[in-house]
Structures are given as C-alpha cells and as structure tokens.
Amino acid sequence: LKCNKLIPIAYKTCPEGKNLCYKMMLASKKMVPVKRGCINVCPKNSALVKYVCCSTDRCN
C-alpha cells in the first residue's frame, strides 16, 4: 500500500501491518489536512480532529 505524505506529490510505502492510509484534519470550516500517512486502525474523530481513512494506493 502506498500512502501520500503531507504534501500529496510525495508518498511512502506502508510497512507490514499498516494497511490503511489516513488524512487527519482540524475540524474547522476549511478542513485543511495537517497530517497524512499509514496507520493500522482508523482513529475516532473528536471535536477538534477529523480522520479520513482508506485502503487503496494514494487514496489519502
């Protein structure tokens, strides 16, 4: 699985066991991504942070 880094023109290959790509955004009107990468379990959203997870190459 290949996941985008913070700047989507760059990506990395995920290590074994991390089979989801994620995008973390501050929960505001703009929803600008502040972090991207590989993860094994999609975190729950909170009042301040929203996560979007997916399982295909460079989907984040």
UniProtKB/Swiss-Prot annotation:
Disulfide bonds: 3-21, 14-38, 42-53, 54-59
UniProt KW keywords: Cardiotoxin, Cytolysis, Disulfide bond, Membrane, Secreted, Target cell membrane, Target membrane, Toxin
GO MF term set: toxin activity
GO CC annotation: extracellular region; membrane; other organism cell membrane
Compartmental location: Secreted; Target cell membrane
Protein name per its UniProtKB record: Cytotoxin 4
Tissue: Expressed by the venom gland.
SUPFAM superfamilies: Snake toxin-like (SSF57302)
Superkingdom classification of source: Eukaryota
Major location category of this protein: secreted
Species per Swiss-Prot/TrEMBL record: Naja mossambica (Mozambique spitting cobra)
